[in-house]
């Protein structure tokens, strides 16, 4: 494991703070949550939503999206300069669902972006509160990760759909800053870099001139972010090669795909944060809870405690199973789309099933869906235990894994062995060890060959009772190893479409 001493903690990145102590970090994160909560309360007042309507996750998503859109400066500028028919660049909106005469109806609302920005700043003591915005982006990203399998995106960049466990954060906007970069998986970074290199191959001017200089520094920055996720010297050396290339092309794409594959066994460190929908923070704030005073952490017990005491509702389509919808949202809340399902079942206290076995579609409702048949139900977001989120990949281990997803990216710091299908992963590494990265490739392959199935990750770490706030008594779970460990198992999840 690379020494973590030099890195600022993710909370520090999120709080622009130089070195802060734990109490300051907790207060600072709490302040961010307070701001989101106050904003949400104000929006519910503006829209005259009932308490039930305000706790509807679909309304929460619309309100979150409106404020993200209002602060998306690059897109706003683009819309001003390229006006499209019937779209007002100064306005933002979306569907709001109301309960009228025993039925759910959809109402499309439209607000001035300026007005939304005013309400947001007012809720955040006059600040732009970018961290609160990033927090909502990560929540949306985690929801996408649990809902969709990015098969098409993987195939388009020349990767393999079975590498989906590396794709955390693949739908995060570019403007999501350091906190966003921290939660991106190795595959996501590789995909962004490959897209960039491909543009350079197709467009002669991509790396040239004034713009080219900016492009180049963005490229090198992304390479460094990816390098920082790897935990072995050979993988890092390979990233140096890719970064220093004079004219990035197919050789670099090859190296990147190689390093992504290697991350299925030699996992990178990817941060995990429990980011909850705004409709959870709002009611907590309005009930008088002071997050800044009490302190809050995205990686400890706090989100679990908050969800134990929250009522969140969701619209349910006619043939959907509310329990399955709950599982989807629960996984999103804990950033756990790529975690081992056996561990998730243990923590949640109810069986967590693979995506393909769930009778539920995404949380968002499309504008052409019929509202007459919509019901709503309570989402069950409580857990039996809690566990500390990890930002390491755990050490490596092999286990029989499934046909769809062939590795996991751990979310919780809990002792277990990490499943991956070694024979499948290794089959991808035949032959190609020539070229300028040959020694690194050989070294990486050797390390992967030596990964042992009986090794345990996160040794001594366990889950905790919800009454054990100080994490004093770790409970090390025991697993039925015959059970299926992968979420996207031979899967039929919908594709993510922008």
UniProtKB/Swiss-Prot annotation:
Protein name: Nucleoprotein
Biased composition (Basic and acidic residues): 8-21
Organism listed in the record: Influenza A virus (strain A/Swine/Dandong/9/1983 H3N2)
InterPro entries: Flu_NP
Keywords: Capsid protein, Helical capsid protein, Host nucleus, Host-virus interaction, Ribonucleoprotein, RNA-binding, Viral nucleoprotein, Viral penetration into host nucleus, Virion, Virus entry into host cell
GO cellular component, as recorded: helical viral capsid; host cell; host cell nucleus; ribonucleoprotein complex; viral nucleocapsid
HAMAP family (alphabetical): INFV_NCAP (MF_04070)
Transmembrane annotation, as ranges: none
Origin organism lineage: Viruses, Riboviria, Orthornavirae, Negarnaviricota, Polyploviricotina
